[in-house]
Amino acid sequence: MPRVKTGVVRRRRHKKVLKAARGFFSGRRKHFRKAKEQLERSLVYAFRDRRQKKRDIRKLWIIRINAACRLNDINYSRFMNGLKLSGLELDRKILADMAMNDSAAFASLVATAKAALK
Protein backbone atom coordinates (compact mmCIF):
# COMPACT_ATOMS: atom_id res chain seq x y z
CA MET A 1 0.00 0.00 0.00
CA PRO A 2 1.18 3.51 -0.68
CA ARG A 3 2.11 5.77 2.17
CA VAL A 4 -0.58 8.25 3.18
CA LYS A 5 0.52 11.70 4.28
CA THR A 6 -1.85 13.82 6.35
CA GLY A 7 -0.45 17.23 5.45
CA VAL A 8 -3.50 18.71 3.76
CA VAL A 9 -6.04 17.13 6.09
CA ARG A 10 -4.08 18.10 9.20
CA ARG A 11 -3.63 21.68 7.99
CA ARG A 12 -7.36 21.98 7.28
CA ARG A 13 -8.30 20.53 10.68
CA HIS A 14 -5.82 22.75 12.54
CA LYS A 15 -7.03 25.84 10.69
CA LYS A 16 -10.64 25.02 11.58
CA VAL A 17 -9.83 24.65 15.28
CA LEU A 18 -7.59 27.74 15.42
CA LYS A 19 -10.21 29.81 13.59
CA ALA A 20 -12.84 28.76 16.14
CA ALA A 21 -10.40 29.64 18.96
CA ARG A 22 -10.13 33.29 17.90
CA GLY A 23 -10.67 35.53 20.91
CA PHE A 24 -9.16 33.07 23.35
CA PHE A 25 -6.22 34.26 25.42
CA SER A 26 -2.53 33.53 24.81
CA GLY A 27 -1.59 29.93 24.01
CA ARG A 28 -5.21 28.89 23.94
CA ARG A 29 -5.47 30.84 20.72
CA LYS A 30 -2.09 30.05 19.16
CA HIS A 31 -1.23 26.45 20.03
CA PHE A 32 -3.33 23.74 18.43
CA ARG A 33 -3.50 21.33 21.37
CA LYS A 34 -4.37 23.98 23.95
CA ALA A 35 -6.82 25.60 21.54
CA LYS A 36 -8.52 22.27 20.89
CA GLU A 37 -8.84 21.51 24.62
CA GLN A 38 -10.20 24.98 25.36
CA LEU A 39 -12.61 24.79 22.42
CA GLU A 40 -14.04 21.50 23.70
CA ARG A 41 -14.43 23.05 27.15
CA SER A 42 -16.06 26.19 25.76
CA LEU A 43 -18.59 24.12 23.81
CA VAL A 44 -19.50 22.33 27.05
CA TYR A 45 -19.95 25.71 28.77
CA ALA A 46 -22.08 26.95 25.86
CA PHE A 47 -24.31 23.86 26.04
CA ARG A 48 -24.73 24.21 29.81
CA ASP A 49 -25.34 27.94 29.74
CA ARG A 50 -28.00 27.80 27.02
CA ARG A 51 -30.07 25.91 29.57
CA GLN A 52 -28.93 28.07 32.50
CA LYS A 53 -29.98 31.20 30.61
CA LYS A 54 -33.61 30.09 30.61
CA ARG A 55 -33.50 29.62 34.39
CA ASP A 56 -31.83 32.99 34.93
CA ILE A 57 -34.42 34.83 32.83
CA ARG A 58 -37.26 33.19 34.77
CA LYS A 59 -35.59 34.16 38.07
CA LEU A 60 -35.35 37.76 36.86
CA TRP A 61 -39.06 37.81 35.97
CA ILE A 62 -39.96 36.49 39.42
CA ILE A 63 -37.74 39.09 41.14
CA ARG A 64 -39.39 41.90 39.15
CA ILE A 65 -42.91 40.63 39.85
CA ASN A 66 -42.12 40.24 43.56
CA ALA A 67 -40.70 43.78 43.77
CA ALA A 68 -43.82 45.23 42.15
CA CYS A 69 -46.07 43.11 44.37
CA ARG A 70 -44.39 44.33 47.54
CA LEU A 71 -45.01 47.93 46.42
CA ASN A 72 -48.69 46.95 46.40
CA ASP A 73 -48.62 45.28 49.86
CA ILE A 74 -48.67 41.63 48.81
CA ASN A 75 -45.96 39.07 48.32
CA TYR A 76 -45.22 37.06 45.18
CA SER A 77 -46.63 33.71 46.25
CA ARG A 78 -49.93 35.17 47.51
CA PHE A 79 -50.22 37.23 44.31
CA MET A 80 -49.70 34.20 42.06
CA ASN A 81 -52.15 32.16 44.13
CA GLY A 82 -54.71 34.97 43.89
CA LEU A 83 -54.31 35.14 40.12
CA LYS A 84 -54.81 31.39 39.85
CA LEU A 85 -57.93 31.51 42.06
CA SER A 86 -59.37 34.39 40.03
CA GLY A 87 -58.90 32.43 36.80
CA LEU A 88 -56.36 34.78 35.23
CA GLU A 89 -53.62 32.88 33.45
CA LEU A 90 -50.82 35.28 32.59
CA ASP A 91 -47.29 34.01 32.28
CA ARG A 92 -44.43 35.48 34.28
CA LYS A 93 -42.89 37.16 31.24
CA ILE A 94 -46.02 39.25 30.66
CA LEU A 95 -46.45 39.96 34.38
CA ALA A 96 -42.83 41.14 34.69
CA ASP A 97 -43.25 43.39 31.66
CA MET A 98 -46.44 44.87 33.12
CA ALA A 99 -44.72 45.37 36.47
CA MET A 100 -41.91 47.31 34.82
CA ASN A 101 -43.78 49.30 32.17
CA ASP A 102 -47.44 49.56 33.18
CA SER A 103 -47.72 49.87 36.94
CA ALA A 104 -51.39 50.95 36.86
CA ALA A 105 -52.46 47.78 35.05
CA PHE A 106 -50.31 45.70 37.38
CA ALA A 107 -51.95 47.37 40.39
CA SER A 108 -55.37 46.37 39.04
CA LEU A 109 -54.13 42.78 38.71
CA VAL A 110 -52.97 42.91 42.33
CA ALA A 111 -56.40 44.17 43.37
CA THR A 112 -58.02 41.27 41.47
CA ALA A 113 -55.68 38.78 43.15
CA LYS A 114 -56.37 40.24 46.61
CA ALA A 115 -60.12 40.04 46.01
CA ALA A 116 -59.83 36.38 44.97
CA LEU A 117 -57.88 35.56 48.14
CA LYS A 118 -60.64 36.86 50.44
Swiss-Prot record:
One of its GO terms (molecular function) is rRNA binding. Keywords: Ribonucleoprotein, Ribosomal protein, RNA-binding, rRNA-binding. It comes from the Bacteria. GO terms for cellular component: ribonucleoprotein complex; ribosome. GO terms for biological process: ribosomal large subunit assembly; translation. Gene3D superfamilies: 6.10.160.10, Ribosomal protein L20. Belongs to the bacterial ribosomal protein bL20 family. Binds directly to 23S ribosomal RNA and is necessary for the in vitro assembly process of the 50S ribosomal subunit. It is not involved in the protein synthesizing functions of that subunit. This is Large ribosomal subunit protein bL20. It comes from Aliarcobacter butzleri (strain RM4018) (Arcobacter butzleri). The gene is rplT.
